[in-house]
């Protein structure tokens, strides 16, 4: 008999089916046993009257929470059952795997008259046993929503003639500078783990691909211990040619994100609200835009936030956080584009205007940076000069060659998929990554 997913059993009332999954809850009394079985699609109550099924008693007595079983039985309607008014009366129960007592507490357990409250294990303890922690409804919903988000963005781009590519993660030179990369031995020389696919995205533009995107790992050798930083994360990058301004890039990104959020809201919005207490907001377009200097001025006037003049060329962590209060007040929006950063704080490959202002932006959502985007410098002589200013000309010699033999104007951006997920469900980056990597975390 083929397996039936639990979300399909309501179509099989009165029929005998086979279901498989983890035991989420087990109540085993003298005369009755109730098993809540969970698979990736839902939950089903298995109801056993022991007098009617004495052959199942020995098997049931061996069961423990989180054990994996296969159950064959008849699907019945029962209005008293909370899980959709449906239960299964089993004919057979086969044990696939018995679970030992769990080493972590995945959810806080409230106190009762007979038992004290049990605190949830810390996030670091839960990451030690991440495969057990990931079985919760909240975690599985988070990754279902992430999958939906990424797939919607992928479809949006494919419908607009983008090509998906996959670039190397072992590279010969750092794409920004040598300070934030992991160095690895590569036979007789050094290599680096890519901190972005930037160089190769632009190589695709020089190759005439015109429109490309990529999803893949990104590595940052930063000793950051915040709830939004990690040393390895999943990136969603794109690049496209024949733009006239970085504003074309901003327009593409806001349309892309809107499509992704719309898909998530339609498929998982109600569940996210139920489990995380957050509304999935599909944003209006265009997104608000502010120059960095104007944002600092607004933050000072409205929130009394000031920074030293030397820091005003970049966005400080506190200004990043306060930007959400500012954009909510003025625009009622979750997103904010910030432009006109100092050239000193931007990558050498960002195009600059006649005043030396980088033609790029940062996108903030709910006070957290999720994107850096820009029009790239495609003119070889100008690009070489900007690389020399940063002291990188020798390190990026191979990259500069991409622009010696013709290259169209182009631009693009990179999104952090894990940060998007984190903000979607109101969790930390440690929760939002399948397996978190940080300065103190390299396992499991």
Question: Model regions: which residues?
Answer:
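A translation/RNA-centric and nucleic-acid-associated enzymatic feature enriched
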Residues: 180-262, 285-444
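Short, highly charged C-terminal tails/helix-capping segments
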Residues: 271-285
């Amino acid at each position: 008999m083929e397996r039936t997913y639990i979300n399909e059993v309501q179509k099989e009332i009165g029929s005998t089916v086979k279901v498989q999954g983890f035991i989420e809850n087990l109540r085993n009394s003298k005369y009755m046993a109730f098993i809540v079985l969970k698979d990736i699609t839902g939950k089903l109550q298995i109801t056993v009257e022991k007098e009617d099924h004495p052959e199942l008693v020995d098997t049931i007595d061996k069961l423990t929470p989180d054990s994996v079983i296969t159950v064959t039985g008849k699907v019945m309607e029962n209005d008293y059952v909370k899980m959709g008014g449906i239960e299964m009366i089993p004919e057979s129960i086969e044990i696939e795997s018995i679970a030992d007592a769990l080493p972590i507490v995945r959810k806080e357990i409230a106190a009762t008259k007979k038992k004290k409250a049990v605190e949830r294990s810390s996030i670091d303890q839960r990451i030690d046993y991440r495969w057990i922690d990931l079985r919760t409804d909240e975690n599985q919903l988070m990754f279902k929503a992430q999958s939906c988000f990424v797939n919607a963005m992928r479809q949006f781009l494919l419908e607009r003639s983008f090509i998906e590519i996959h670039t190397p993660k072992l590279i010969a030179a750092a794409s920004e500078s040598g300070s934030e990369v992991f160095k690895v031995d590569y036979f007789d020389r050094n290599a680096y783990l890519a901190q972005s696919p930037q160089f190769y995205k632009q190589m695709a533009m020089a190759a005439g691909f015109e429109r490309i995107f990529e999803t893949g790992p990104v590595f940052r050798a930063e000793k950051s211990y915040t709830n939004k930083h990690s040393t390895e994360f999943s990136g969603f990058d794109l690049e496209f040619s024949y733009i006239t301004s970085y504003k074309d890039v901003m327009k593409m990104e806001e349309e892309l994100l809107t499509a992704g959020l719309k898909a998530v809201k339609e498929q998982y919005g109600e569940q996210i609200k139920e489990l995380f207490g957050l509304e999935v907001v599909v944003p209006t377009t265009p997104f608000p835009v502010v120059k960095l200097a104007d944002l600092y001025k607004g933050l000072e006037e409205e929130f009394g936030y000031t920074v030293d003049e030397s820091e005003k060329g970049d966005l400080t962590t506190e200004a990043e956080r306060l930007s959400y209060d500012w954009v909510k007040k003025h625009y009622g929006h979750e997103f904010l584009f910030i432009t006109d950063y100092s050239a000193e704080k931007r990558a050498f490959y960002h195009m600059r205007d006649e005043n030396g202002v980088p033609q790029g932006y940062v996108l903030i959502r709910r006070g957290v940076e999720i994107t850096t985007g820009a029009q790239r410098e495609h003119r070889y002589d100008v690009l070489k000069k900007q690389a020399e200013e940063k002291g990188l000309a020798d390190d990026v010699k191979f990259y500069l060659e991409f622009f010696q033999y013709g290259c169209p104007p182009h631009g693009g951006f990179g999104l952090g998929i894990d940060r998007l997920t984190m903000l979607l469900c109101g969790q930390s980056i440690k929760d939002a990554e399948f397996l978190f990597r940080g300065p103190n975390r390299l396992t499991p």
